């Protein structure tokens, strides 16, 4: 099955070479890290993005401390990362099971750490509308606790997961970091407050941070049960099993879908940059393109149907979700210029890798 989908994909899609200067910059940083071991803290380490960060950093010979309360993270993600690595590299990982809403956990985790990659949060716009108190507790109190703990531990850099939801009702495309609208959900409010707190900590305490506004990140270890940008894994599972798919709205809603390897790259570049002008900034993390839900379905259907011979056609349309924006597309010129970011995967390459991972899970 996997060999079939690989041959189909690569006949039509060839990955572009990494000859540009931005990609060379990232390659140099990874090469340098292998021989220059640092201590990293990843909050939300058992989550989708957190576990991908863990895999990359351990593979680069780094020491990693991880924090997770397993409310949305999954121990299976950590087990999968362990299966990909040598026992020597895996021994560089220490897990602290705890919650970032507990300041004691945060201070313990930050001890002797060089870089913090703060991913822990309660994601999902619908969840925040249903339970704004829990979202506020995790995303604002937890964030503030981590800022205090990182400040007191004198970490070199605090990198955190911001969100494209911060753009709110601002309609103009592409989205540029310095122009935002009114938040459309409690989740969006919490992520904007994170940016405000990070800025205040720089002004008040001289603490350096970088915020990364993720645009619909997807990829391996994002399951159909994931609360964050769940449309892709839900649809993959449904198409594979020839089950019904629901499209919110008329199918023309569009997103700047960003494969998880691009998000990992952004975190590493942000943590290690020596460009002083790049510090204490907010950056879009995306590919600078957008795909409608209807086109996303067609792409996934094309990838999966040719492998399973299911010819999926069970599609139904329903109302728009509360709090959702109509269109989203990022301007990535700022992160490209200041952090030398260059996406390794666009939508087609990312979907191929994601579908391949899902097929491995169901074999």
Question: What do these predicted regions represent?
Answer:
Residues 24, 33, 40, 59, ...:
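C-terminal substrate-binding subdomain of Rossmann-fold SDR/epimerase-dehydratase oxidoreductases
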Residues 1-217, 267, 271, 341, ...:
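N-terminal Rossmann-like NAD(P)+-binding domain of SDR-like oxidoreductases, especially those catalyzing
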Residues 104-107, 114, 126, 133, ...:
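Residues in well-ordered alpha-helical elements
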Residues 145, 222-223, 253-255:
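Heptad-repeat alpha-helical coiled-coil signaling segments
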Residues 83, 203, 237, 302-305:
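Short alpha-helical segment within the cytosolic histidine kinase core of two-component systems
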Residues 193, 197, 201, 231, ...:
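Hydrophobic alpha-helix immediately C-terminal to the catalytic Tyr-X-X-X-Lys motif of short-chain
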Residues 73, 101, 130, 138-141, ...:
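Residue-level signal for the nucleotide or nucleotide-sugar donor/cofactor binding architecture
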Residues 173, 224-233:
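A glycine/serine/threonine-rich, flexible loop-to-helix segment
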């Amino acid at each position: 099955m996997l060999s079939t989908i690989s041959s189909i994909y690569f006949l039509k899609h060839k990955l572009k070479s990494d000859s540009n200067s931005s990609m060379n910059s990232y390659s140099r940083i990874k090469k340098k890290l292998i021989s220059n071991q640092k201590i990293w803290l990843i909050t939300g380490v058992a989550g989708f993005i957190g576990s991908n960060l863990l895999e990359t950093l351990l593979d680069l010979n780094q020491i990693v401390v991880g924090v997770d309360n397993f409310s949305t993270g999954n121990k299976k993600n950590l087990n999968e990362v362990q299966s990909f690595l040598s026992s020597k590299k895996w021994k560089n990982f220490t897990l602290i099971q705890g919650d970032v809403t507990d300041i004691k956990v945060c201070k313990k985790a930050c001890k002797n750490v060089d870089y913090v990659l703060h991913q822990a949060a309660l994601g999902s716009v619908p969840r925040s509308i249903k339970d704004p108190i829990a979202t506020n507790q995790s995303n604002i109190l937890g964030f503030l606790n981590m800022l205090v703990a990182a400040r007191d531990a004198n970490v070199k850099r605090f990198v955190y997961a911001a969100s494209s939801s911060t753009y709110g009702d601002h309609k103009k495309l592409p989205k540029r970091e310095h122009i935002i609208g009114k938040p459309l959900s409690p989740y969006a409010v919490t992520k904007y407050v994170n940016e405000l707190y990070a800025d205040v900590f720089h002004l008040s305490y001289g603490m350096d941070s970088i915020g990364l506004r993720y645009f619909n990140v997807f990829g391996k270890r994002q399951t159909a049960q994931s609360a964050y940008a769940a449309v892709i894994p839900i649809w993959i599972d449904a198409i594979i099993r020839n089950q019904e798919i629901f499209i919110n709205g008329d199918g023309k809603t569009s997103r700047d879908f960003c494969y998880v390897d691009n998000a990992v790259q952004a975190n590493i570049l942000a943590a290690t940059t020596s460009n002083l002008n790049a510090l204490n900034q907010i950056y879009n993390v995306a590919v600078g393109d957008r795909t409608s839900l209807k086109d996303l379905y067609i792409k996934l259907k094309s990838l999966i149907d040719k492998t399973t011979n299911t010819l999926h056609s069970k599609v139904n349309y329903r109302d728009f979700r509360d709090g959702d924006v109509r269109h989203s597309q990022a301007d990535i010129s700022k992160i490209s210029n200041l952090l030398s970011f260059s996406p390794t995967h666009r939508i087609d390459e990312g979907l191929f890798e994601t579908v391949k991972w899902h097929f491995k899970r169901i074999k």
